[in-house]
Amino acid sequence: MDYTEFFAVQKGLAVCYSGYRHGQRPGHLYPTYKQVKEDLLIIEKQWQYIRLYSCDAHSKTVLEVIKDEKMTLKVMLGAYIEAEENNVNCPWGGSYALEQLSKNKKRNLQQMDALITLANTHPDIIFSLSVGNEACVDWTDHLVSVEAVISYVRYVKAGAKQPVTFCENYAPWLDKLEQLAHEVDFISIHTYPVWEHKTIHEGMEFTKQNYDNVANKYPDKLVVITEAGWATESNGYGIPQDNVNDDVQKIYYKALSHWSTSQSILTFVFEAFDEPWKGS
């Protein structure tokens, strides 16, 4: 299935965008209008589509800049959902007090309302919607049940006209998310060969395999790659330091871009700019 027909858009390159600079982070200090404009002017030279992760002040500024500056960028807008369940399988956390989980559920519903509002406010800019990001995979620190995600999908589909998805690692789509796959308008997968100990010589074939496995399981669904990339640095945990640098990232990006363009697969590269608050 061709994404240009599905979304009624032109072919183009896509990138994930989050503009947090030194001293900035979500929920605290956000990029200014001027900073966002500076970023988007750079992005617009090479990419036609950007993915945003949350319905927060930053995303509202991004949409404002695109509208006011008459930019041609189109947006996949996401709602960021927090943990609604504890996850003992998360290596770096994932356990919360019941009171916090209850607060998160309320906040997640607020994110859905904000997603619908922004989608209806900017229908000419926002071409698709996501109700969450990596909230069902077994290692996540913000675990949400499949049933809850399905309820969010239905809620947003009832309130907005844009196609609705959920962004997740490729693996859960092969089993755990089968019911969800029938609810979303299209499937969104993440593929990171370097995180699964693949060398640059194995990376592109691994990404193709990830995509094909999901696409073949759901032949009637459009599959979009909403995150793919290769790191340039490592702190030594999870990724061997000798498997990441600027050169291998360039090799992977060129191969990914060539393959996805030739196959007409909408693919969001992660990411446009480094975010210092995340670490390495």
Language-model regions, residue ranges each:
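Substrate-binding and catalytic surfaces of secreted/luminal carbohydrate-active proteins
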Residues: M1-T4, L52, Y152-Y155, P163, ...
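Hydrophobic faces of well-ordered beta-strands that scaffold small-molecule active sites
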Residues: K11-Y17, Q48-L52, L73-A79, F127-V131, ...
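Acidic-and-aromatic substrate-binding clefts and catalytic sites of carbohydrate-active enzymes
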Residues: R51-T61, A83-N86, K105-N108, V137-D138, ...
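Substrate-binding cleft of extracellular glycoside hydrolase catalytic domains
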Residues: V62-Q162
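Aromatic- and acid-rich polysaccharide-binding/catalytic face
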Residues: L77-A79, V88, F127, N133, ...
